C-alpha cells in the first residue's frame, strides 16, 4: 500500500483528534488513604500512564475551605521509575483543625502535573497515635494506690512525645482528677499514680486519656474499687462441650477445677446451679442446685435435660434454641476458711455444633473467573472450629478448615452478570444431616466500566503468615478480545493500619493470563493488610477504563519486636523471701515496664489486663478499610480498601462519609430391751421400704420434735409417712431418755520437747498484691541482636503464684506485651491466716488460721500460738500465752479458729506463730486487720449552694455561710470528716440545630441578566456557600459541589463588573443613573464573597468611596437618586416609611462589612461611618417600624452604640421577645429579625438569643422565590453567625475561696470551662462553720458533706436469719466415748426471715477449745427418711475436728428449725475459747447470722468492760492481790514503784453499783500517797470499774478502806471524769480501821502500811 493521500491523512488526523485518549494523552492519577491523620507521615502515590519523559509534580495539601497550604512536596515522575512515585506528607495540627466542632474535617490534596491539576478532597482524622494504659492491678480497695502507666505511641506504634490529658472518672462518669502532661523526653512512657480516698464510690472506675489536640479520640482503661480480701485459691468451670445440643439426652456436663494459688489441688465442697440466659435476662433453674464434692481439685456436675425442660416456660425445646446456659459455682474449703465464686456463661443452646460465616468473603465476583470463598466456621461459643470439612452446593468444592476456622473454597463462576447464590454446608461424618450447619450468601457481579469484559482477580494461598514469609499473589486477567496486549503492568498498593505501606508495579509480559507477585512479609504487615491492584487501558469504547481488585490478608498477631521474661530454670522450689533472678530479653534501647501481681487479683477480676491482642484489637478498630476485599466496581475496590483515587480524566472514588466503616445489621445403741421392742415393731412391716420408714421413726434424735413434725420431712409417699408415725408414736411411749482427740490449751508439759521458741520465729508480714513496678532499660545487644537484662529480686512473703507482666516500648520496634511469666512460691508447712476485709470495734468475731502440711508421708505435731495484742481482747493476754497443740496428717490442713474482740480503730496487727515438734520447722504470719467504728457510716449533707456570682452575688461577689454539721448522734471516740466539694457547671447554651445543608440546594443558581438581576442571582449562591462553610455542612451537601458553587460566584462577579460605571457605582444598566442602594448591596455581597473568591479590592473600595463622596449628606444621611427597577430585591426598605434611616443603616452596615478591606484605601471611611451613626442615634427613639428599629439597631451595634436608651427600645419592639414583626409581611419580618439577631450576637446577649433563633427556625424559611433576596441573604448570614458565636459561648471562669478557722490560710480553686465538670474537694477533720466567696463568670455547685459514724438506733447484726445457739450439760445417761472427760448438748435453732423457705443453706460451726462433735449423732441426722441435714463435713485431721460444716436442704420461714447433737470434751484446758455458729444462704452470701456459745457465758461472749462506748478487755486475771502471797513493806514499796504505776491512794468504798457486765465502785480518796496523772484531791470521789467475773474475788465491802494503786493505762475517760479500771495490774489491799489495828491479826499490817505511806510521801520512789 502506497503512501496515504492528503485527504486520507486529514481524515486520520481528524479521527485521532476526535479521540484524544487514543493519541496517548497521559492519564495522571493520585492515590491517597481516604482518611489522612494529623501529625502522621502519610503516603500519596502519583502515577502517569502512557506518558513520555520526566514529569515534575508538586503535591500540596490545602485547608478545604480557605485553601491555605498546609504542606507541600515535590517529586519527578521518570520513565525509569515507570512514572510511579510516592511522596510522604505530614499535615500539621493547627487551630484550623479544631476537633471540638461537630462534623468531619477535610483537606484538598492537589497534584500539579505540569499543566494538569488533579485534586481530591480527603477526610481528616485527629488520630495521630494511640494511648495504651496499664494499671498495676485490676482491682483495688478504698484507701489504696493505683499505679498506672500511659504508653504514648504514634500510628506506627512507636514512642511519641506529645501532650496528653488524663482523667480519672467515678463509676458515674464524674472526673475527680485531671492531669495535662507531656511525654517529651519520657521515651513514650508516663508513670503516674492516684491515691484512692477511704470514702469512695465502689464499682468500675475509668482512666481516660487523649492527646490534647484530639479530645474526641479517647483511650480508656478500667479498674474496680471494692472491699475485698484476696482468695487463696482459684476456680475454673469447664463444660465438656462449649455448647449444648437441644436434643442431647445426656445433658450438659461441667468439670469444676479448684487449685490453690500456689498450684496445689483444693479439697472442699462446691454448690452448683445452672440457668438459662436470654440477652440480659437470667433465669436460674432452682431444681438444678446441687452440692458437689471437690476432691483433689476436681468435681463434676450435670444439668440433665429433664431439669432444664422443667425449669423453663414454655417447656419446649424450640423456645430454648438461640438462648444460652450459664453455670454458677461456689467452692468452700473443708475448713470453711475461704470461699470462691466462679461463673461460666454463654454456653449456647444449639441445633448444630457449628456456625458458618462469610465475614471474610468478598461480596463481589468477576463473571467467568474463580471466586475465592473464605468460609469461617466457628463453634457456638464463637471460637474457631478447625478440621471441619465444608462443601459448596452445586459445584461440590470442598476444603478443611484450618486452626483459625477458615477454609478457602475456589468456585468457578458463570459468565453472567446475574447475582450468584452460594450455599455452603459442613460435612462432619459423626453428625446426622439435620445437625450439619448450612449458610447461604449472595455475591454480586463486579461492574465494569462501559459494560466491557475487562476484569482483574487477585488470589492468595491460604496459610498462616508471619514476618519472614513470602506470599504469592496471583493476578488473573480477563479482557475484551484484542485488548490484553495493552496491559503491560499492574500497579499494586499495600494498606496496613490505615497507612499506604507500599506501592509497586508488577510487569506483565504479552500473553500472560496469570502473573505471580512474590510479596515478602515484614513485621510492618502485622496484624493484617490489604493488597489493592489495578490496571488501566483504552477500552473498546475508546474511553479510558480502570479495572481493580483487592484482597485482605491476615498475619499472625505477635509483637513487631521481641520481649520475653524468663526465670532461673534451677529455681524450681521458691520460698517466700527468697532471692531469684529474672531475665528480660528484648530489643536494644527498649524500655520495659514491669509489675508482679498476685494471681489472686486475677481470680477476682481478670478483665482489665493489658495484652498484646488488646493492642491489636485497638489498632484493627482504626483500620480505614471496610471489607474483606473486592468491590462493586473499580471505585468501590479503592473505597472499600480505604483509598481515595482520582485521575485527570475525572475518574474518582466517592467521598468517604465517616471515619468508621458502616456496620452490617445485627444479629446412735439402745438397751437390749428397747432394741428388741423396736425390732418387734419393725417386724410388723413385711415390705422392705416400709420397714425402713418404721425403723427411722423409732430412731432417737436429739431434737424434741413431735412425730408429726418429723414426718413432714419425708418425701417417699403417704404409706411411708403412716408407717413412720405409727412406729414413732410406739417408741415414744416406751422410750427412756438415755470427743475429739485434740490437745489444746496451755499444755505446759510439752514445752520441754524439742521445739523452736516463739521469739525465734520471724513472721511473714509483707503481703503486697503487686510489686516490682519499675521501668528497666535494655542496653547493649548480644550477637543475635537481642538485649538481655538479668535482675536479682527478693520475693515477698506471700505463698502464691506471682505473674510477672512486662510491656516494652522501643524506638524501632514499638510496643510489645510479653506473655506473663509465673513464679510459684510455697513451702511444705505454712500458716494461711484468713482475715476479713474489716471488723467492727467492740464486736466479737472469729478468725481462722489454716495450717497446711504438704509433706508426703509425715504427720506433724504442731504448737500454734496466737500472740497477744492489747488492741484485741482474746484468749492471749499480756500474762498468759495462748497455745494449742494439734496434729496435721500428711498432705492435709487444719483450721484453728480464734475468737477476738477488736478494741481500737485502725489497722491492727494479728499474729499467729506455729512450730513443729522435733523438727526445725516453723512459720509465722503477721497481718493487719482493719478495725472500723461501730454504727453506720453516714454521709450527711450540710449544705448545697448554686454559685453564680453575676446573678446571685453583690457587685459580682457571692458570699456563702456554711454552718457546722450536727453530729449529736456520732459514735464517741471516732473522727468525722467534712468534705467541701466544688464542681463547675459548664453549661453550653446549646445551639439550635443548624438548618440542614441539603435544604439549600435550590440556592445554587447561575446568575444572569442586568446589574440588578445578576445580583439577585448571585446572592443565594454567595450566602449558601458562606452558610455551608460556617456550619461545616458540605459533607451533607456534597464535598465536590463547593467548587462548582465557587465557579458560579466567579461568574456572577465577572458579569457584575460589566455594570460598573466609571464612577465605580452600579446601576441596572450602564445608561441609568447609579443606585445608592444597589452600589451598597454590591459592596455588601462582594465583601462576603472576598472570603471565597478573588475580589479586586479597587473594585470594592471604589464603590465605597463613591457612596461616601457622592451620596452622603453633611448630616450623615445617605440619599438615593437612582432607585432600583427590581423593587422586590430591596426587602423591607421597599416600604417608604422611615426610608432615610433605613437606607443610611443599610449603607452603614455595608461600609462596616467592607472596612477590613478598604480602610487603608478610603481615608474618609471611619468619619463617614461615625456621621451616619450619629444621624441614626438622633433618629432612633422616634422610629415606629419594627423593621427600621431592627436594621438601625444592628448598625448601632456594629459601632458599639446600642446602649440605653436605644437598647431598651430595641428589645421592647420585639413581639414576645422573639421577633421584630409587621402584620402580613413574612419576608420583611424574617429580614428584620435576622438583623436583630446579628445585633444580639454582637451584644453577646446570649440569654435573649435562643427564642429569636427558635422563631427563625420555626418559619421553615430556606430562601429563594420572588422578592426573597434580602430575607435569604440576611437569615443565612444571621444563622451562620449564630452557629459560629454560640458554641463558643462557654463562660466559666470563677475563683472560689474559703478559709477554714482551723487553718492558717485560705483555700482557693479556679473553675474554668476546660475542666469545669472536674470534681474538686477539700477535706478537713474539723467540724466547723466557715464562709466561702465566689467571683467571676459562670455557674458552679458547692456541696458540703459531713462523713461520720452514727450510732445505730437498734443493733442489727443478722441479715435475713434468726439464730439461737445454746449448750447444756448432757445427763449422766448420755452415751459418750470412754476418753471423753465431759459431754454436752449443742442446740442450734434457726429460722429464715424471708417470704419463702431458704433452700440450700449452710451452718459453719466452730467448736469450743477441747471439744469435738459426736459423729454418730451427725450420721443419724443425715440419714433416714426424715433427714434433718443433707450432709456434714469436718476437718480431715482426726486430731483437730474444730470446724464442722452442716448443709441443710432448707430452713423454714414459718417455724424454727432446730438441730441438737452431743459434743464431747476430750481435754481440760485452762481457758475455753468460745465456739461460734454462722448460718448463711448459698444463694446470697450476704444473708448471714453469727452467734457464739460457751458453757460459762450465756452468749459465748468474751469479757470486756464498756464505758461511754469505750471497751477494754477483761478476760485477764482480776487484780494483783493474792491473799496467800507473803506481803511485807519491801514488797509493797517494790510493787508500787514499778514502771508504769501511776497513782497510790488510800480510799474508802462509799457506793457499789452492780450492773449486767461490770461493777462500779465509788471510792472517796482519803489520802493521795503518790499523785498520778489524775489531779485528784483528798475528799474527792472517783469510780473504779471491774468486770462481774471479778466480783467474788474482790469481795469489796461498803464503808471499808483500801490501799490501791494501778497503771496509767488503767485510767479511763477525760478529766475531770476520770474512771479507774480494776485489772490484772491493780493492787487492792484491805486497810484495817484503827480499832482493827488493835487486833494482833492486823497489827503488823497496820504498822507496815503506816511505814509504807511515810516512805512514799517523804522519800517517794527510788527510781
UniProtKB/Swiss-Prot annotation:
**PTM description:** C3 precursor is first processed by the removal of 4 Arg residues, forming two chains, beta and alpha, linked by a disulfide bond. During activation of the complement systems, the alpha chain is cleaved into C3a and C3b by the C3 convertase: C3b stays linked to the beta chain, while C3a is released in the plasma. The alpha chain is cleaved by the serine protease complement C2b component of the C3 convertase to generate C3a and C3b following activation by the classical, lectin and GZMK complement systems.
S-S bonds:
559-816, 626-661, 693-720, 694-727, 707-728, 873-1513, 1101-1158, 1358-1489, 1389-1458, 1506-1511, 1518-1590, 1537-1661, 1637-1646
Glycosylation sites noted in the Swiss-Prot or TrEMBL record? 939, 1617
Keywords for the protein's UniProt record, in alphabetical order: Cleavage on pair of basic residues, Complement alternate pathway, Complement pathway, Disulfide bond, Fatty acid metabolism, Glycoprotein, Immunity, Inflammatory response, Innate immunity, Lipid metabolism, Phosphoprotein, Secreted, Signal, Thioester bond
Any idea what this protein is called?
Answer: Complement C3
Q: Where is this region: Interaction with CFP/properdin?
A: 1634-1659
Gene Ontology MF annotations:
C5L2 anaphylatoxin chemotactic receptor binding; endopeptidase inhibitor activity; receptor ligand activity
GO cellular component annotations of the record = cell surface; extracellular region; extracellular space; protein-containing complex
Sites annotated Cleavage: 747-749, 954-955, 1303-1304, 1320-1321
Q: Which residues form the Anaphylatoxin-like domain?
A: 693-728
NTR domain residues are 1518-1661
Residues at the site labelled Coordinates Mg(2+) for interaction with Complement factor B Bb fragment (CFB)? 1663
Q: What functional role does this protein have?
A: Precursor of non-enzymatic components of the classical, alternative, lectin and GZMK complement pathways, which consist in a cascade of proteins that leads to phagocytosis and breakdown of pathogens and signaling that strengthens the adaptive immune system.
Activity regulation (UniProt): Complement activation is inhibited by VSIG4.
Q: Give the Phosphoserine positions (modified residues).
A: 40, 671, 968, 1321, 1573
| Signal peptide region | 1-24
List GO BP terms, alphabetically: amyloid-beta clearance; B cell activation; complement activation; complement activation, alternative pathway; complement activation, classical pathway; complement receptor mediated signaling pathway; complement-dependent cytotoxicity; complement-mediated synapse pruning
Following inactivation of the gene, the phenotype reported is:
Null mice displayed altered lipid metabolism and morphological changes in adipocyte distribution. There is reduced adipsin/CFD expression, increased number of smaller fat cells, decreased DGAT1 expression and activity, and less triglyceride storage capacity associated with delayed postprandial clearance. Mice on a high-fat diet exhibited no diet-induced up-regulation of adipsin/CFD expression nor adipocyte differentiation.
Question: Isoglutamyl cysteine thioester (Cys-Gln) crosslink: positions?
Answer: 1010-1013
- Primary place of residence? secreted
Gene3D superfamilies associated with the record: 1.50.10.20, 2.20.130.20, 2.40.50.120, 2.60.120.1540, 2.60.40.1930, 2.60.40.1940, 6.20.50.160, Alpha-macroglobulin, receptor-binding domain
Complex and partners = In absence of complement activation, the C3 precursor is first processed by the removal of 4 Arg residues, forming two chains, beta and alpha, linked by a disulfide bond.
SUPFAM superfamilies assigned: Alpha-macroglobulin receptor domain (SSF49410), Anaphylotoxins (complement system) (SSF47686), Terpenoid cyclases/Protein prenyltransferases (SSF48239), TIMP-like (SSF50242)
Report the subcellular localization.
Answer: Secreted
Amino acid at each position: 500500500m502506497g503512501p496515504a493521500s492528503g485527504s486520507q491523512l486529514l481524515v486520520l488526523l481528524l479521527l485521532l483528534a476526535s479521540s484524544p485518549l487514543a493519541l496517548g494523552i497521559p492519564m495522571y492519577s493520585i492515590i491517597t488513604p481516604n482518611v489522612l491523620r494529623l501529625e502522621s507521615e502519610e503516603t500519596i502515590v502519583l502515577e502517569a500512564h502512557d506518558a513520555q519523559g520526566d514529569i515534575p509534580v508538586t503535591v500540596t495539601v490545602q485547608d478545604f475551605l480557605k485553601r491555605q497550604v498546609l504542606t507541600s512536596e515535590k517529586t519527578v515522575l521518570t520513565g525509569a521509575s515507570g512514572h510511579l512515585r510516592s511522596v510522604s506528607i505530614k499535615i500539621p495540627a493547627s487551630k484550623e483543625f479544631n476537633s471540638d466542632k461537630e462534623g468531619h474535617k477535610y483537606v484538598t490534596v492537589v497534584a500539579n502535573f505540569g499543566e494538569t491539576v488533579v485534586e481530591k478532597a480527603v477526610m481528616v482524622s485527629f488520630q495521630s497515635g494511640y494511648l495504651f494504659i496499664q494499671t498495676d492491678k485490676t482491682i483495688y480497695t478504698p484507701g489504696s494506690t493505683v499505679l498506672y502507666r500511659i504508653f504514648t505511641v504514634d500510628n506506627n506504634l512507636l514512642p511519641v512525645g506529645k501532650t496528653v490529658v488524663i482523667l480519672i472518672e467515678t463509676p458515674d462518669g464524674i472526673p475527680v482528677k485531671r492531669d495535662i502532661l507531656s511525654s517529651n523526653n519520657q521515651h513514650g512512657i508516663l508513670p503516674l499514680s492516684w491515691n484512692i480516698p477511704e470514702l469512695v464510690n465502689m464499682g468500675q472506675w475509668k482512666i481516660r486519656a487523649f492527646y490534647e489536640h484530639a479530645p474526641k479520640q479517647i483511650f480508656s482503661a478500667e479498674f474496680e474499687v471494692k472491699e475485698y480480701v484476696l482468695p487463696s485459691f482459684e476456680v475454673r468451670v469447664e463444660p465438656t462441650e462449649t455448647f449444648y445440643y437441644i436434643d442431647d439426652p445426656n445433658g450438659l456436663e461441667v468439670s469444676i477445677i479448684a487449685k490453690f494459688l500456689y498450684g496445689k489441688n483444693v479439697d472442699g465442697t462446691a454448690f452448683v446451679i445452672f440457668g438459662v440466659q436470654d440477652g440480659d435476662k437470667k433465669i436460674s433453674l432452682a431444681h438444678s442446685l446441687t452440692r458437689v464434692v471437690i476432691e483433689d481439685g476436681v468435681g463434676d456436675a450435670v444439668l440433665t435435660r429433664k431439669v432444664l425442660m422443667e425449669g423453663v416456660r414454655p417447656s419446649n425445646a424450640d423456645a430454648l434454641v438461640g438462648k444460652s446456659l450459664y453455670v454458677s459455682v461456689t467452692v468452700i474449703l473443708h475448713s470453711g476458711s475461704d470461699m470462691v465464686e466462679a461463673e461460666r456463661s454463654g454456653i449456647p443452646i444449639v441445633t448444630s455444633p457449628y456456625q458458618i460465616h462469610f465475614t471474610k468473603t468478598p461480596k463481589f465476583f468477576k463473571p467467568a473467573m474463580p471466586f475465592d470463598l473464605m468460609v469461617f466456621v466457628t463453634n457456638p461459643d464463637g471460637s474457631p472450629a478447625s478440621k471441619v470439612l465444608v462443601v459448596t452446593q452445586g459445584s461440590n468444592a470442598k476444603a478443611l478448615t484450618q486452626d483459625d476456622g477458615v477454609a478457602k473454597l475456589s468456585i468457578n463462576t458463570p459468565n453472567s452478570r446475574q447475582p450468584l447464590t452460594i450455599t455452603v454446608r459442613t460435612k462432619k461424618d459423626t453428625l446426622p444431616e439435620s445437625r450439619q450447619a448450612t449458610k447461604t450468601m449472595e455475591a454480586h457481579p463486579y461492574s465494569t466500566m462501559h459494560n466491557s469484559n475487562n476484569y482483574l482477580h487477585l488470589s492468595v494461598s491460604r496459610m498462616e503468615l508471619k514476618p519472614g514469609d513470602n506470599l504469592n499473589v496471583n493476578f488473573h486477567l480477563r479482557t475484551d478480545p484484542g485488548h490484553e496486549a495493552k496491559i503491560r503492568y499492574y500497579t499494586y498498593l499495600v494498606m496496613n493500619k490505615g497507612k499506604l505501606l507500599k506501592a509497586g508495579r508488577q510487569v506483565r509480559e504479552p500473553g500472560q493470563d496469570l502473573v505471580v507477585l512474590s510479596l515478602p512479609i515484614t513485621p510492618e504487615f502485622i496484624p493484617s493488610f490489604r493488597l489493592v491492584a489495578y490496571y488501566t487501558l483504552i477500552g473498546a469504547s475508546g474511553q479510558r477504563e480502570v479495572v481493580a481488585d483487592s484482597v485482605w490478608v491476615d498475619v499472625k498477631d505477635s509483637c513487631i519486636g521481641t520481649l520475653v521474661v524468663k526465670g532461673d530454670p534451677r529455681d524450681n522450689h521458691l520460698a517466700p523471701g527468697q532471692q531469684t533472678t529474672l531475665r528480660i530479653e528484648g530489643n536494644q534501647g527498649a524500655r520495659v515496664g514491669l509489675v508482679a501481681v498476685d494471681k489472686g487479683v486475677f481470680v477476682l477480676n481478670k478483665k482489665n489486663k493489658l495484652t498484646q491482642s488488646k493492642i491489636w484489637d485497638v489498632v484493627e478498630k482504626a483500620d480505614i478499610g471496610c471489607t474483606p476485599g473486592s468491590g462493586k466496581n473499580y471505585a468501590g475496590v479503592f473505597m472499600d480498601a480505604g483509598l481515595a483515587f482520582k485521575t485527570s480524566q475525572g475518574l474518582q472514588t466517592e467521598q468517604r462519609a465517616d471515619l468508621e466503616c458502616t456496620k452490617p445489621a445485627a444479629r446412735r445403741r439402745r438397751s437390749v430391751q428397747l432394741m428388741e421392742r423396736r425390732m418387734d415393731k419393725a417386724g410388723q412391716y413385711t415390705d422392705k421400704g416400709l420397714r425402713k420408714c418404721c425403723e427411722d421413726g423409732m430412731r432417737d434424735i436429739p431434737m424434741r420434735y413431735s412425730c408429726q413434725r418429723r414426718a413432714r420431712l419425708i418425701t417417699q409417699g403417704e404409706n411411708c409417712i403412716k408407717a413412720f408415725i405409727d412406729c414413732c408414736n410406739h417408741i415414744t411411749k416406751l422410750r427412756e431418755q438415755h470427743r475429739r482427740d485434740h490437745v489444746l490449751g496451755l499444755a505446759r508439759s510439752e514445752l520441754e520437747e524439742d521445739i523452736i521458741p516463739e521469739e525465734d520465729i520471724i513472721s511473714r508480714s509483707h503481703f503486697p498484691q503487686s510489686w516490682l513496678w519499675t521501668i528497666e532499660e535494655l542496653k547493649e545487644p548480644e550477637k543475635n541482636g537481642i538485649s538481655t537484662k538479668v535482675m536479682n529480686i527478693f520475693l515477698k512473703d506471700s505463698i502464691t503464684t506471682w505473674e510477672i507482666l512486662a510491656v516494652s516500648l522501643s524506638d524501632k520496634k514499638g510496643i510489645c506485651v510479653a506473655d506473663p511469666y509465673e513464679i510459684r512460691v510455697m513451702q511444705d508447712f505454712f500458716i494461711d491466716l484468713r482475715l476479713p476485709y474489716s471488723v467492727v470495734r467492740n464486736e466479737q468475731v472469729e478468725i481462722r488460721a489454716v495450717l497446711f502440711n504438704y509433706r508426703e508421708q509425715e504427720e506433724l505435731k504442731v504448737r500454734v500460738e496466737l500472740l497477744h495484742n492489747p488492741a484485741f481482747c482474746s484468749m492471749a493476754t499480756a500474762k498468759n500465752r495462748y497455745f494449742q497443740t494439734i496434729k496435721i496428717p500428711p498432705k492435709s490442713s487444719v483450721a484453728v479458729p480464734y475468737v477476738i474482740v477488736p478494741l481500737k480503730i485502725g489497722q491492727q496487727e494479728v499474729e499467729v506463730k506455729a512450730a513443729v515438734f522435733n523438727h526445725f520447722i516453723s512459720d509465722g504470719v503477721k497481718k493487719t486487720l482493719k478495725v472500723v467504728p461501730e454504727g453506720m457510716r453516714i454521709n450527711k449533707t450540710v449544705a448545697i449552694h448554686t454559685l453564680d456570682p453575676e446573678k446571685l452575688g453583690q457587685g459580682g461577689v457571692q458570699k456563702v455561710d456554711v454552718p457546722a454539721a450536727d453530729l449529736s448522734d456520732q459514735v464517741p471516740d471516732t473522727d468525722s470528716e467534712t468534705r467541701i466539694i466544688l464542681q463547675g457547671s459548664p453549661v453550653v447554651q446549646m445551639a439550635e440545630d443548624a438548618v440542614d445543608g441539603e435544604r439549600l440546594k435550590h440556592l445554587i443558581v447561575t446568575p444572569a441578566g442586568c446589574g440588578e438581576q445578576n445580583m439577585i442571582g448571585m446572592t443565594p449562591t454567595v450566602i449558601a456557600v458562606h452558610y455551608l462553610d460556617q456550619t461545616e455542612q458540605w459533607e451533607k451537601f456534597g464535598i465536590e459541589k463547593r467548587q462548582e458553587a465557587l465557579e458560579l460566584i466567579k461568574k456572577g462577579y465577572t458579569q457584575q463588573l460589566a455594570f460598573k460605571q466609571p464612577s465605580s457605582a452600579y446601576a441596572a444598566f450602564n445608561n441609568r443613573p447609579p443606585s445608592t442602594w444597589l452600589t451598597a448591596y454590591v459592596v455588601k455581597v462582594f465583601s462576603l464573597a472576598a472570603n471565597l473568591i478573588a475580589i479586586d479590592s479597587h473594585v470594592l473600595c471604589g464603590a465605597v468611596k463613591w457612596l461616601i463622596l457622592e451620596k452622603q449628606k453633611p448630616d450623615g444621611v445617605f440619599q438615593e437618586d437612582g432607585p432600583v427597577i427590581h423593587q422586590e430585591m430591596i426587602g423591607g426598605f421597599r416600604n417608604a416609611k422611615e426610608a432615610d434611616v433605613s437606607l443610611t443603616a443599610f449603607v452603614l452596615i455595608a461600609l462596616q462589612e467592607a472596612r477590613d478591606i478598604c480602610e487603608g484605601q478610603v481615608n474618609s471611611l471611619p468619619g463617614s461611618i461615625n456621621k451616619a451613626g450619629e444621624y441614626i442615634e438622633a433618629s432612633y427613639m422616634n422610629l415606629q417600624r419594627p423593621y427600621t428599629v431592627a436594621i438601625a439597631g444592628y448598625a448601632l451595634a456594629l459601632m458599639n452604640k446600642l446602649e440605653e436608651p436605644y437598647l431598651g427600645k430595641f428589645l421592647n419592639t420585639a413581639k414576645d421577645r422573639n421577633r421584630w414583626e409587621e402584620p402580613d409581611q413574612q419576608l420583611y419580618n424574617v429580614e428584620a429579625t435576622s438583623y436583630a439577631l446579628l445585633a444580639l450576637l454582637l451584644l453577646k446577649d446570649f440569654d435573649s438569643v435562643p427564642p429569636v433563633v427558635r422563631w427563625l427556625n420555626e418559619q421553615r424559611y430556606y430562601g429563594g422565590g420572588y422578592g426573597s433576596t434580602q430575607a435569604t441573604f440576611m437569615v443565612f448570614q444571621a444563622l451562620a453567625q449564630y452557629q459560629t458565636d454560640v458554641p463558643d459561648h462557654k463562660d466559666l471562669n470563677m475563683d472560689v475561696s474559703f478559709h477554714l478557722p482551723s487553718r492558717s490560710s485560705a483555700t482557693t480553686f479556679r473553675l474554668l470551662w476546660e475542666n469545669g465538670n472536674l470534681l474538686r474537694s477539700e477535706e478537713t477533720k474539723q467540724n466547723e462553720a466557715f464562709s466561702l466567696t465566689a467571683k467571676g463568670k459562670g455557674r458552679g455547685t458547692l456541696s458540703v458533706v459531713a462523713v461520720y459514724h452514727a450510732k445505730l438506733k437498734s443493733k442489727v447484726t443478722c441479715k435475713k436469719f434468726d439464730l439461737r445457739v445454746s449448750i447444756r450439760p448432757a445427763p449422766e445417761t448420755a452415751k459418750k466415748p470412754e476418753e471423753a472427760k465431759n459431754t454436752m448438748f449443742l442446740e442450734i435453732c434457726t429460722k429464715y426471715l424471708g417470704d419463702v423457705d431458704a433452700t440450700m443453706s449452710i451452718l459453719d460451726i466452730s467448736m469450743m477449745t477441747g471439744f469435738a462433735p459426736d459423729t454418730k449423732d451427725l450420721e443419724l441426722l443425715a440419714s433416714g427418711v426424715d433427714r434433718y441435714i443433707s450432709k456434714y463435713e469436718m476437718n480431715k485431721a482426726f486430731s483437730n475436728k474444730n470446724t464442722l460444716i452442716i448443709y441443710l436442704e432448707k430452713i423454714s420461714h414459718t417455724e424454727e428449725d432446730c438441730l441438737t447433737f452431743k459434743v464431747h470434751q476430750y481435754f481440760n484446758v485452762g481457758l475455753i475459747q468460745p465456739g461460734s455458729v454462722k448460718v448463711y444462704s448459698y444463694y446470697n452470701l450476704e444473708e448471714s447470722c453469727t452467734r457464739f456459745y460457751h458453757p460459762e457465758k450465756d452468749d459465748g461472749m468474751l469479757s470486756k468492760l464498756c464505758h461511754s462506748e469505750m471497751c477494754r478487755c477483761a478476760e485477764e486475771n482480776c487484780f494483783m492481790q493474792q491473799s496467800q502471797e507473803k506481803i511485807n513493806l519491801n514488797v509493797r514499796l517494790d510493787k508500787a514503784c514499778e514502771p508504769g504505776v501511776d497513782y497510790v491512794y488510800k480510799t474508802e468504798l462509799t457506793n457499789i453499783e452492780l450492773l449486767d457486765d461490770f461493777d462500779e465502785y465509788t471510792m472517796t480518796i482519803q489520802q493521795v500517797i503518790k499523785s498520778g496523772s489524775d489531779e485528784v484531791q483528798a475528799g474527792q470521789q472517783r469510780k473504779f470499774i471491774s468486770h462481774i467475773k471479778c466480783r467474788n474475788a474482790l469481795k469489796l465491802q461498803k464503808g471499808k478502806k483500801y490501799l490501791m494503786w494501778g497503771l496509767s493505762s488503767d485510767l479511763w475517760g477525760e478529766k475531770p471524769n476520770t474512771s479507774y479500771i480494776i485489772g490484772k495490774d491493780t493492787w487492792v489491799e484491805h486497810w484495817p480501821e484503827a480499832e482493827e489495828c488493835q487486833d494482833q491479826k492486823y497489827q503488823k499490817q497496820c504498822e507496815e502500811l503506816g511505814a509504807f505511806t511515810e516512805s512514799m510521801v517523804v522519800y517517794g520512789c527510788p527510781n
